[in-house]
Amino acid sequence: MCSSEECLIDKSWTSEEKCEYIKCNQDSCEGGGYLTWSHYVKCQYNIGVRVILIILGILYLIILFVIMSSIADDFFCPAISGIVSHLRMSESIAGVTFLAFGNGAPDVFSSISSVLTTPKPKADLALGDLFGTSIFVTTVVLAIIIFTKSFKVAIIPTLRDLIFYMTTLAFIVFCFLKFDKIEVWMPATFLGIYGVYVVTVIILGIYRTHRKKRNLKKKNKELEDFLSRPSSAASTTPIFGAMKLKEETISVSALFHFMIGYSQFIKNLTRANLKRTTNNNNNDNKNEKRGIVNLGFSEPYSIPSERKISTIFKQNTFETDLESLESLADLDGSDDEGREEKFGYAHHTVFTSHDQISLVASEIEEIEITTWRSWDWVWDLFNHLKSWPSRDEFSEMNIFIKIVTVIKVVPVFFFKLTVPSNEMSWCKPLFILHCFASIQFALFSIQIITLKPFDGSPGLWLYGLGFSAILAMVAMYFLPLSKEQKYYKEIYSYLGFLMSIAWIYATSNEIVSVVTMIGVVTGLSMELLGLTIMAWSNCIGDIVADIAVVKQGYPKMAMAAAIGGPLFNLLIGFGLPFTIAAAQGKEMELLINPVYRLLMLFLGISLVTTFVALFIQRFTVRRPHAVLLIFIFVVFLIFICLAEFHVLEWN
C-alpha cells in the first residue's frame, strides 16, 4: 500500500484505510506545502466537518490565487523592471527574458513546485497546467483581445512566435510518441530552443534598429532641409500642410509628443502638473485614479490649423538629432512592431512607465525624519506598511475590485514586511524590519527554517536571526535616517526579486496541495485539474491586463503577450524543472493518455488556425477569427470531459 507512484484510492476501502493510505503516501497524495489538505479531509470521519474542510480548502485556494497575482504584479514585475533598467538591457532581450519571466512566474513556479517538491514528480499536473494555460490563452484570451478591437498585427514578431510555438509542440509530440519516460536531454532541448529563440529575437532586433536608423537618417536630412527654408515661408505655413516628407505627413500627435519629450520647459510644467494632480485629486480629476498623469498623452492632441510652425519652434527649443528623430518615428507608429512603451502592471491596471511613477508617488506620503526622538518615523513606517486604500479610492472601486482589495489587505501587509520594493521611498525602520523578516521568511518558504546543519545544532532560524541582528546593527550605525542611499533602488530591485520568488514558490506549493486534495476527493485526474483550475486561474490576470493594454491603444503588445507568453511558459516551465529533476535521477513517465492527446491536438489546431487566419486576413485580425477560436475551445472542453469520464476512448 505504501510507496505508491500515484495516489489511487479504492472506493471499497474503509475511511480508516483511506486515511492510512494518505499518511503512507504523502509524496503522491500531498502537494508539498505546509498544509496537508488530503490528510485533513480523508482522516476526518465526520461528514459535516469534512465538507466544511473542503469548502475551506476551496476558499483558501481562491485566496492563494489572489496572493499569487498580487505578489507577481505588485512586487515581482517592478523588481524585474528595475533590474532590466539597471543592467541597461535592450527591450528585445529584456522582453524575452526578465519581463517574460515576470509575466509567466505563476505558471513557471507552479510547474517547478509540482515537479521538484516531491521525490515522485507530478509531471501530469505540471504538463496539464502548462498545456491548459497555452490552450486557454491562445484561444479565449486571444479571442477577447480581437473582440475588443480589430487591428493589424506586427507581422515579423507574430510569425516568429507562432513558428517557434509550433516547432516546440511538434517536439513534444515526438517525445510522447517515441519514448515512455523523460530523459535529461528532452527538457534540455527545450532550454536550447529557448536559447535559439532569444538569439533570433536579438538578431531581428538588431536588423530592425539598423533599418530604422537608416530610414531616420534620410528623414533627418529632409527635415533639416525643410527647417532651413526661409523663415517667412515657414512662418506662414500651417502645420498640417507643411510637414510632408516624401508624400508622408508626420502626424500632429507625433510632432507634439516629440516637442514635449525634448523640451525642458514642458518637462518642468509636467512636474508641476504631477504635483498638483497628486495633491489636489478632488478637483477636476475626481473620477480618475489619484496621482496618475499620462505624460505620453495617449489621445492625439489637436492643434488649431492657424498655428504657425515658426511660433511653435520659438516657444519650444529642441534638437533635431538622430536620437530625437528615433523617438519621433516610434511615436508616429510607422514601425512594424508598433509603439514601444515600457509598461508597469499594478493593482490589475496597466500603466505606462511614467504613470507608474506617479502611482507610487501618490500611495505613500513623504515625511521628513530628522531624529529618532520624534515619532515621525513611526508614522512613516505606518505609511510604508499600510495595505489598504483610502476611503475615496475604495468608494470608486466596483464590487469585484472591492472584494479583491479586502482579501489582499493582510497578504499585502506581509508582502511589504518581507519584500523590499524599489517603488517605495527610503524608510530606515522598514529596512531594519526587512533584515529580520525577509531572512526568516526566505528560510520558511523553502521549508528549511527548522533544519539542523549538524547533530545538536539549533535550527537555521537561529543562525538567520543572528545574521539579521548583525545587518540591523550595521544599518543602525551607518545608514542615515532620511537620506536615500545612492544604490537603494538597484539593491532593492534585486532583493525584491529574490523575496518575490520566495513568496511565489511558497504560494505555488500551497496551491498544488489544495488542487491535489481536490483530485483525491473527487477522483479527477491531475491533468484535468491542471488544465482547468490551475490554468484558468493563472490566466485571469492576463485577461485583465491584455484588455487594458488594448484599450490604451496597444493591441499588438497584447497579442504578442498572448502568443509569446505561453511559449515562454512552456519552454521554461517544462525545460527548467524537468532538466533539474532528470539530473537528480528522478524517474518521470511519459504517458500519452487520451487527455494528453487532446491537449496537444487542440493546441496545435489553435496555433495553425491563427497562423493560417493571419494570411487569409492579410494580417488584420477580425471578429470571425475570434469566434472560430472560441468554438475551438468549446469543442476542446467537450472532448476533454468525454475523455475524463471514459465516454471517449482514444487507443
From Swiss-Prot:
It is found in: Mitochondrion inner membrane. Residues 72-91, 148-161, 205-398, 450-458, 508-510, 581-595, 648-651 are cytoplasmic. It is a multi-pass membrane protein. Residues 113-126, 183, 420-428, 480-486, 532-559, 617-626 are extracellular. It comes from Caenorhabditis elegans. Pfam families: Na_Ca_ex. Keywords: Antiport, Calcium, Calcium transport, Ion transport, Membrane, Mitochondrion, Mitochondrion inner membrane, Sensory transduction, Signal, Sodium, Sodium transport, Transmembrane, Transmembrane helix, Transport. Changing residue 205 to E: In gk-773708; development defects in stereotyped left/right axon guidance choices within the GABAergic motor neuron circuit. The chain crosses the membrane at residues 51-71, 92-112, 127-147, 162-182, 184-204, 399-419, 429-449, 459-479, 487-507, 511-531, 560-580, 596-616, 627-647. Mitochondrial sodium/calcium antiporter that mediates sodium-dependent calcium efflux from mitochondrion, thereby acting as a key regulator of mitochondrion calcium homeostasis. Required for patterning of neural circuits: functions in the same pathway as RAC-dependent effectors of the unc-6/netrin signaling pathway to set left/ right patterning of the VD/DD GABAergic circuit. Its main location: mitochondrion. This is Mitochondrial sodium/calcium exchanger protein. GO terms for molecular function: calcium:sodium antiporter activity.
